[in-house]
Structures are given as structure tokens and as C-alpha cells.
Amino acid sequence: MAGKARVHELAKELGVTSKEVLARLNEQGEFVKSASSTVEAPVARRLRESFGGGKAAEGAAKAPAKAAAKGDAKTAAKGDVKAPDKALDAALDNAIKAGGNGEAAAPPAQPGGTATTPAAQATPEAPARPGPAAARPSAPAPGQPKPPAPGQPPRPGATPGPRPGPAPKPAARTPRVGNNPFSSAQPVDRPIPRPVPRPGAPRPGAPRPGASPGNMPPRPGGVGGPGRPARPGAPRPGGGRPGGPGGRDGGGGNYRGGGVGAPPGGGGGFRGRPGGGGGGRPGQRGGAAGAFGRPGGAPRRGRKSKRQKRQEYDSMQAPVVGGVRLPHGNGETIRLARGASLSDFAEKIDANPASLVQALFNLGEMVTATQSVGDETLELLGSEMNYNVQVVSPEDEDRELLESFDLTYGEDEGTEEDLQTRPPVVTVMGHVDHGKTRLLDTIRKANVREAEQVTVEHDGVERPITFIDTPGHEAFTAMRARGAKATDIAILVVAADDGVMPQTVEAINHAQAADVPIVVAVNKIDVEGADPQKIRGQLTEYGLVPEEFGGDTMFVDISAKQGTNIDQLLEAVLLTADAALDLRANPDMEAQGVAIEAHLDRGRGPVATVLIQRGTLRVGDSIVAGDAYGRVRRMVDEHGDDVEEALPSRPVQVIGFTSVPGAGDNLLVVDEDRIARQIADKRSARKRNALAARSRKRISLEDLDSALKETSQLNLILKGDNAGTVEALEEALMGIQIDDEVALRVIDRGVGGITETNVNLASASDAVIIGFNVRAEGKATELANREGVEIRYYSVIYQAIDEIEKALRGMLKPIYEENQLGRAEIRAIFRSSKVGIIAGCMITSGVVRRNAKARLLRDNVVVSENLTINSLRREKDDVTEVREGFECGMTLGYSDIKEGDVIESYELVQKERT
């Protein structure tokens, strides 16, 4: 036994029990725990000697199987076919021991020598015949390795004999030709009788009867001598799936032909499920069914379900868009939000987003699956697939978002008995410098804020009125529109000496769009040149007909500076409110309102001026406004006093937001901070998607070349003192139209001072920071100087717009215009070791200047462009220019010149772009 041996293997070899072996080892001083323990080779040798196995037993166990097989082969070749059963059993035992535990052994044959394998029974014995049938070489017997090819040295360790210890190994003899499976010369075959197997019980170590040797490693070959050649045309036993055990006369299925008396060859072939039938058609391999763990038998084809058939039919009927087959709709409506991606669309129609991407690519538009897509693209793609794509408006989208949390906005809860009278909300609108703010100062005798509430006596009863001021600048269109939507009555201020101006018309349009009644205040009647009747005539063109002209619009002539007719104006406001409006609200519900303005205060954080429209806002309520949320920590009225609650039509400053809300965002009170945060997060994501879809520039395959060209882009970061100013500045800057070569992009915007975060973002994106009525905080200025970030400060919005427009014009690629200078004809060519080739020229027209651009003409064909006149000499002097009619020498840095060529000189003049 080579190497270490286990105790139970030694016990089986010696024919004793494991306990006896363990006891004997303990007597010899070897500490062995159990029958599965291993012992070294010297210990095993001493153990065999102690049991009296002698050198014969040791030699049988230690000698390689090759020597034993060679001896048997010699005996068979000499004709000694009547070997006793004991010799045969000893040879088989030696072969099994030498082959190891994992080798396959033959099951015991049935009494009488009948084989157990049907394939072996069906194969009759026949004498071997020379010829093509004997061309298959026989394999070595079990226990005998394959003999080496002629001229190849045998493997070391193949010599027989006992091995009591390290001893020199004698050289192996050259095997006979007949035992070499690779030799072309084969011995004359003669029938050799099989040795009679000994009947009895199966020996230890032999496989169980009926076990399949196909699951065992292959053996080198049979025990006997050269094998009997196969019969021509007969099927090979065991070809294909592994079968049952064969008889003693059956050769291995895929083994190299076993000799006479070899152990039974089971089904050969691949490892698979045991018990499969071997064979196939005569002369061919069996099928591979069952091989590599595959189930045998013919594959089953089940019937398709109705759903599978329907899916196949729908796929065949699906429309092909851009060469891609897509799902076919039934005309149903698909609702998508603004800035939806192809993944969102694919999820709605149960399609693959990659198919939609490929379809759009084939149609000429390049987008990704997660990229925001414009509304037109979604509608076009949906119409091709027979879907009606409906892009949800922002109002509907926000309403659906609130409904998902069981919330509503814009409706009073309760019955008619729960509604109570509220003060009117009045917005003052008009053109810039027409006296809006002065009018409010006169009304409240103090500086006005964004929203104020004053008390007016009407019919002997004091009634409060809430005023909202709006800017009159052109850039603040959105603020005027918000003021018109949040108000009940609009006061239109028109200067009597100036007349109707563009912002006046815009304010009229906003008020009429919001269906708000208008009271006209004709201001500055005390100024020289004032004509109130002219104002009435001009406003008639816009549908504002005075009552004295038979209309329903109240006109009041006032002077905000002198305080003239202010009471009549307030009286007109209350009369209009009582006549045309139902000013009632339910104060016993959760508060709802609108953020008029918002800014970032250094000491208090985000501060929002909120107008409560219905319900009551209290300190401690969880609120959400746009994409900002928080909890009310403090409320301040227009006088700077703290208040605990705010009733309908009451303006207050709310402190407690986590971020600055947008001007015009709806305010809503919710039950928990968690709900407020979820609503704010979803609104923020929706806003980002909509902004990405709006700012994405469509790139088609037709203009791909132009899109890939370098485009100048100016990145800006906007910071302002309040949200309305930042919004107005951004809209004004985005409205600048210069050229397609330059682009303006606002990468960030915010309320408050310029921070180090803004500077870092500007440094990373090569942006310019615009500060409107704000300054840099802390070390932001030092960081900007160190990083080279430019910060511009403005307090007038028009100045910022003009400078940004000039910067964009400076980023345009310059346009150069060619200005012809003169022509020179080459009369002679000189060569110099210092300057190279010199052209001796005559100036035929114009003037030639040094360092000017030149082109070389030969027979009126341009030979070279974009040359430079490096040097210019007249006689021996260096000159800057040579005029017509004079000779000169010049160098162009170009060697391919000939006499008669013409040098044309020109200069490029940059043309200013407009």
C-alpha cells in the first residue's frame, strides 16, 4: 500500500477485525484512536509482519499491478489455461488492492458462469477472426497499466517485487508487441478458454450486485490477456447511457476492449442517471439522453395557454415604430407628469424602456431611459403606439399628490353656518413710479411691507382691509400675477400726467384673467399737466368703462402726496367688496393660504410672509409650502408683534421653515411632520424633472454635427434678498436672446447671502455668482479670490441684465472679414543659409506689409493658404511695407515657390457681432 493506510483497510487486507488491528498497534507502541485513523508505511509493514502475512502478502499488496498482470499474461500466452481457482482469486485480489478503493470491480458471476447483463447474454461467443474486425486493439488487463509505446521509457515504479524499504528499482522489461495498443503489429489471435469463476458469496470490496459501474471511475482494463476482437457490425455493449452490470464475457462499453475473463463491463458512456439502457443503432454510439444530468427520453411539448397565444398574437399585431416592435394600445389615455422619462412611460404601458429608447433613436432623437422628455415627444410616441398621452398640468398633478394623502386645497370645510365674514384683500398694481407705495404709505402713515392690514371706518363701523403691494418693474410679471390671484380687489394706480403705460396694461390683463374687480385710482392730480379725463378715455379701450360713462368701474381722482380723496378710495373699495364679493371663510379648519414673499434672515432663518385664506394658523402647526416644510415656531404681524394665531385674510410672517419657500406657493397645514416632508420631497423631485425637461435641448441626428461643436456657455449662480427678486432676475436673464452659439444656464439659485458652498459650486462648474442686494458671508470672499471665482453685486435689476447681455455677446465667436492689401509677382529666387528661400518680387498693386497674411497663386490657382510674410527688405534695409511699383525681397516660410508665382497679401479684420 503506497503512502499512508487506514486501520480498517489494513484489517480488511489482513482478514481480521479493526479492534484486533488497534490492539496490535497499541502493543507496538503506536497511538491510534479509531478505525478511520491512518498509519505510516513502516508501521503498516511491521503490522503485516506481526500478523504473519509474510513477504508474499506484503509483495502482493505493495507491488504495482503491472507486474502481476504481466505474469498472468505470460502464463496465458504459454497456454497454461488451467490455473487453479486459488491463483485466479489471488490475482483478482491483488488487482483490486493495487487499483485502490475508488476503482470499479466486477460483481460476482452467477453459478454456472452465466452472465447477468442482457447485453452480454445476447452476444454469442465466436472465435476471433483476423481482418478488419480485429483492428480494435485490446486494452491491458486490470492491475496492468498501459504499456509504453515503442521507444518510450516505462514509468518509474512499475517493477514487481516486495518493497521492504527503500530499494533500487530494476529496469522494466520491454513489453510484448501484442500488449501495446498503439502498435500496428498485432499477434495472431487464438481463443483462450475463460477461467471458471468460483461460485459463492461476493468478496469484500466488490460492488453490490446490480450496482452500475457507470458511476465509478474507469478501470485500466480487464485481468486476462489480450482481448477478443469485436464482431463486425455488432453493437458495442454499453455505448450511450450507463446500463446494468454485464457478465464476465462482456467488455467495457467505452473501455478499451477487455480481455477474456475480464471483470464485467457495465454500461460505458457518459455519467448520467444509472439504469439507462445502453446501445443504439448497430455501429453507432448511443444517445446522449441522461448524459451530464439531463433527463432521458424525448422532450415534451406542452400545449400553449390562451395567455401565451394571446401574447404572441398581440406581438405580431404590435406597431413597428422606427424598426422596433412596440406594444399596441387600444386608444386608452396615459397620464404622465411634466418631465416624465421613458421609464415612466414604459411602466404605464408595461413595455421595455430600451425598446422606446431605440424607437426614438431610429426616429432621429437621442434620449436615455431616465432622461426627462418633452411633452411633444411623449405625445408623438404615444400616438404611434395608439395611446393618448396626456401630460398632467401642474395644478392637476399637485391636486393628485394631495389626494394621495387625503388632503384638499381651495375649499372651505363645513356648512354655511360655519362660514364667517373676513376682511377683503386688496392688491395695489400699476406702472413703476406711478405712486403705488406712496399711496399705501399715506393710508397707513408708515412704510409699507409686502402685506399690511389697516383699519378703515365705513358706515360708522371699523373694518379691516388687507393690502398687498406689488412691484411695477417689467421683470416682476410673475409677482403681479400672484398678487392678482391672491387678492379680492385690485386697485389700479395710473398717473394723471403719464397715462397708460405697458405695465399698466399688464396689470389690467392679470386682474381680468383672475376675474378680480378693479378700482382705478387716478393719482398725481395735483401735478401740472394732469388730465384725469384723458386717463378715463384711454382705459375705456381696455374694457374699464367709468360709471359716469355708463360702465361699472369706479374711478377715484386722488393725490397720494397730498392725501386727497384717500377716504373716497377706501369707501369705493368696500362698496365694491360688498356689492360683488362673498367674503366669508371657515376659521375652524386647518389653515390654508399662500406665501406672498419669502427671504432668508440671518438671525431667524427662512421667513415667509403668508396670507391666510381660510382656517386658522397656530404656533406649532406642521406646514408645507411648495417644496419647503417645517413647523410654525413663531408668527409676527405687520407691526413686529408676536401673534399666536392668524385668522382668514390675515398676513403674518411665519418662522420655522427648513428652507425658503417659493413666492406664490400654497401653504397647507398637515397632521404630522412626516406627511409634510413627504409632500415637499415629491414636489421637489417633480420640479427638478420639469426643469430638466424644459432646459434639455433636443438633439437630432440631422444636426448632430453642429451639436457636437463647441458651444460657449455662461453658467450663473443667482443669490438675492428674497424669492421674488431671484425669480424675476432669472426670468429676465433667460429671456436674453443672443445667438445659438452661446447659451445661458442658471445652475443654482437661492435666497440669502453668498456662502462658501456657492463659491465651491462656482469653482467646480466655472460659473459666475450674481448677488442681488446680498453680500458674501464669512470667508466666502477669501475663498472666491483664492479659487478665482468672479462675484458680481447688483442692486438694480436692469444693470444686471445689461452686463450679462454684454458678457454673452463677448462670448460669441468672432467673425473675421478679409481685407485685400496688395499683390506681388516673383521675379527671382535666392537661397540663403540663414533665412532659407528668398523671393525677389515686384509689387504690382496695393501694398505689402510685413507680418501680414499671404497666399501663393500659380496660374491663378491657390497653391498655399494662410502664409505669413516673415521678413520684408527693400535693397539692404528691413522695411515694414513696400508699395506698388517697387521691388523687394520677402520670405514666406514656404519653399515651393517658382518664378512667375503671385503672392497675394491680405489682413483679417474682426467684425463686431450684433
From Swiss-Prot:
InterPro entries: EF-G-like_DII (IPR053905), IF2_II (IPR044145), IF2_N (IPR006847), P-loop_NTPase (IPR027417), Small_GTP-bd (IPR005225), T_Tr_GTP-bd_dom (IPR000795), TF_IF2_bacterial-like (IPR000178), TIF_IF2 (IPR015760). Residues 69-84 have a biased composition (Basic and acidic residues). Residues 300-309 have a biased composition (Basic residues). Residues 52-84, 98-326 are annotated as: Disordered. Residues 57-68, 98-138 have a biased composition (Low complexity). Residues 421-581 form the tr-type G domain. GTP binds at residues 430-437, 469-473, 523-526. One of its GO terms (molecular function) is GTP binding. Residues 139-169, 193-207 have a biased composition (Pro residues). The keyword Transmembrane does not apply. Keywords: Cytoplasm, GTP-binding, Initiation factor, Nucleotide-binding, Protein biosynthesis. It holds the Pfam family IF-2. Its main location: cytoplasm. The keyword Cytoplasm applies. It is found in: Cytoplasm. Residues 236-296 have a biased composition (Gly residues). One of its GO terms (cellular component) is cytosol. One of the essential components for the initiation of protein synthesis. Protects formylmethionyl-tRNA from spontaneous hydrolysis and promotes its binding to the 30S ribosomal subunits. Also involved in the hydrolysis of GTP during the formation of the 70S ribosomal complex. Belongs to the TRAFAC class translation factor GTPase superfamily. Classic translation factor GTPase family. IF-2 subfamily. This is Translation initiation factor IF-2.
